Amino acid sequence: MQAHPNTVDPSEIAKFEAMAAEWWDPHGKFKPLHMLNPCRLDYITRQIAGEFDRDLGTERPFAGLRLLDIGCGGGLLSEPMARLGAEVVGADAAEGNLPVARIHAEQSGLEIDYRHTTAEALAEAGEQFDVVLNMEVVEHVADPLSYLRATHDLLKPGGLQICSTINRNPKSYAMAILGAEVVMRWLPRGTHDWSKFITPDELFDLLRQAGLEPVDRKGFVFNPISWQWSISDRDLSVNYVTASLRPR
């Protein structure tokens, strides 16, 4: 297994540690993620169920699957995955997020293994998972290709990675930077760096270079009239998500 340089950007970590206490406030600084979460969960659960032949109508359809949530924050994705039966490890480089995540999981009666660590450190330790959730992280790392190589090594052969990020174009600047940070003030200014955004074609190329096989991509589209998100087969102009496999 190859060595993985640390791709953590300290300035990016500091941004999220400063907001840690607000993770579970649906009207706080993580309001955009709370609004987006139903779409994220719908895509994630369907992809996992399809890949591992699980029936979402059962009580714990993901029982027996080991899942890693990279950049878990306060646990907005880790907790639903645990409720569905997965053995969940939540990893975050921002240590300040983890007390919030642990307390909320305990209050919810969920067993989640939250760790202050990075994808690279877990890969170096030889950890492997059936599923890796890599949601809204890749645009915050210093070296996306090196980071994705680590996430590849974290997957068991045949394992599934779900990776979401933000496209890089004038529309994404208008919506993710000007709209979310300046006009609506959903996020503190500087939360995102537009130059770090990645186009879908660039991400597919990076995933392939990392040894993964991209199998799907969809857009997450925000409707400003209904104030709801939906999944789109065609509109990947701002937020989008991909599914890829580690070959067996």
From Swiss-Prot:
Protein residues bound to S-adenosyl-L-methionine: 40, 71, 92, 135
Superkingdom, natural source: Bacteria
EC number: 2.1.1.222, 2.1.1.64
Pfam families, per database record: Methyltransf_23
Pathway: Cofactor biosynthesis; ubiquinone biosynthesis
Matching InterPro entries: SAM-dependent_MTases_sf, UbiG_MeTrfase
Biological process per Gene Ontology, one example term: methylation
Catalytic activity: a 3-demethylubiquinol + S-adenosyl-L-methionine = a ubiquinol + S-adenosyl-L-homocysteine + H(+); a 3-(all-trans-polyprenyl)benzene-1,2-diol + S-adenosyl-L-methionine = a 2-methoxy-6-(all-trans-polyprenyl)phenol + S-adenosyl-L-homocysteine + H(+)
UniProt keywords, alphabetically: Methyltransferase, S-adenosyl-L-methionine, Transferase, Ubiquinone biosynthesis
GO molecular-function terms, A-Z: 2-polyprenyl-6-hydroxyphenol methylase activity; 3-demethylubiquinol 3-O-methyltransferase activity; polyprenyldihydroxybenzoate methyltransferase activity
Family to which the UniProt record says this protein belongs: Belongs to the methyltransferase superfamily. UbiG/COQ3 family.
Role noted for this protein: O-methyltransferase that catalyzes the 2 O-methylation steps in the ubiquinone biosynthetic pathway.
Name the UniProt record assigns to this protein: Ubiquinone biosynthesis O-methyltransferase
Provenance organism: Ruegeria pomeroyi (strain ATCC 700808 / DSM 15171 / DSS-3)
